[in-house]
Swiss-Prot record:
Keywords in alphabetical order: Cytoplasm, Methyltransferase, rRNA processing, S-adenosyl-L-methionine, Transferase
Family to which the UniProt record says this protein belongs: Belongs to the methyltransferase superfamily. RsmH family.
Binding site for S-adenosyl-L-methionine: A32, G33, H34, D52, F79, D100, Q107
Signal peptide, first to last residue: none
GO cellular component term, pick one: cytoplasm
Lineage: Bacteria, Bacillati, Bacillota, Bacilli, Bacillales
Reactions that this protein is recorded to catalyse: cytidine(1402) in 16S rRNA + S-adenosyl-L-methionine = N(4)-methylcytidine(1402) in 16S rRNA + S-adenosyl-L-homocysteine + H(+)
Gene Ontology biological process terms from the UniProt entry: rRNA base methylation
Molecular functions per Gene Ontology: rRNA (cytosine-N4-)-methyltransferase activity
Class of enzymatic activity (EC top level): transferase
Pfam name, any one: Methyltransf_5
Subcellular location per the Swiss-Prot or TrEMBL entry: Cytoplasm
Protein name: Ribosomal RNA small subunit methyltransferase H
EC number: 2.1.1.199
Length: 312
């Protein structure tokens, strides 16, 4: 069964200031924890559109949320296509959107999906099982330079060159097929003193390959830009990020949206059309409480940022 500890559950939904008759979007359905809590706040006029590109997540959510079936629409799609999918269903604007950008724990834990460096499986890492590009293709066919780039940019891996060189050496002998083989390559490439500190040596490389396979950062940027155009005045967008790359994209997009155009200083009155359309709901990101961290270690790096469209 799809088990997933929902991070910042109450904070993420409560910060949306849910209207009982509003229209909401869960851009990252996953284990459906946020969706369930949000649906609980809606009356018979309210509705939730829940997106996931993983059919397993949708199938499990249909069971978990069976009591709310008249209030929720499930959409199997990448959240970068959210606006188009909503428009097709006659929805032009919504009251709130939430994102939980953590990979669902079940996906990490399902051996055959190939996300985990703890279990040996085929190199896959696709969120959408119907897409062609897999981790095996990245590892075996991408150039030495491209591997260095993704390991460094997406994994912030100090030993990117050493790992890419070892991959190149091994794949010349035979294709690299499994996560276990990749872990072995990473352990060979990273110097012993560095291997012994800072968690599993494969963590950064696996993250980098997963982001590349699923174009996660491109999807986040596309989706958030569209989300800003979907939100009604007074509506909010909540975004939970788990690593600095996604957080940087979210922070920059939100800062850009809350800035008005450059005006000469000293104007006595600023016309409405020159005022920004958005404001940050909190000055600093919200982070999990000590209590939550004790119960769920995966929440440690979570940050919640919230933006609101100003009513003019």
């Amino acid at each position: 069964m799809f088990k997933h500890e929902t991070v910042l559950l109450h904070e993420t939904v409560d910060m949306l200031e849910v209207k009982p008759d509003g229209i909401y979007v869960d851009a990252t359905l996953g284990g459906a924890g946020h969706s369930e809590y949000l649906l609980n706040k809606l009356n018979e006029k309210g509705h939730l559109f829940a997106f996931d590109q993983d059919q397993t997540a949708i199938d499990n959510a249909k069971i978990k949320l069976a009591d709310y079936s008249d209030k929720v629409t499930f959409i199997k799609a990448n959240f970068r296509d959210m606006k188009e999918a909503l428009n097709e269903r006659g929805i032009e604007a919504v009251d709130g959107i939430l994102y939980d950008l953590g990979v669902s724990s079940p996906q990490l834990d399902e051996r055959e999906r190939g996300f985990s460096y703890h279990q040996d499986a085929a190199l896959d890492m696709r969120m959408d099982q119907e897409q062609e590009l897999t981790a095996k293709t990245v590892v075996n066919e991408w150039s030495y330079q491209d591997l260095i780039r993704i390991f460094f940019q997406y994994g912030e891996e100090k030993f990117s060159k050493q790992i890419a060189r070892e991959i190149e050496r091994r794949r010349e002998v035979k294709p690299i097929e499994t996560t276990g083989e990749l872990v072995d390559i990473i352990k060979t490439a990273i110097p012993a003193p560095a291997r012994r500190k800072g968690g599993h040596p494969g963590k950064r490389t696996f993250q980098a390959i997963r982001i590349a396979v699923n174009d996660e950062l491109g999807a986040v940027e596309d989706s958030l830009e569209k989300a800003l155009t979907l939100i009604k005045p007074g509506g909010r967008i909540s975004v939970i990020t788990f690593h600095s790359l996604e957080d940087r994209i979210t922070k920059q997009l939100f800062q850009e949206a809350t800035k008005g155009p450059d005006l000469p200083p000293g104007l006595p009155v600023i016309p409405d059309e020159y005022k920004p359309d958005f404001k940050l709901a909190t000055r600093k990101p919200i982070v999990p409480s000590e209590e939550e961290l004790e119960q769920n270690n995966r929440a440690r790096s979570a940050k919640l940022r919230v933006i609101e469209k100003i009513i003019k």
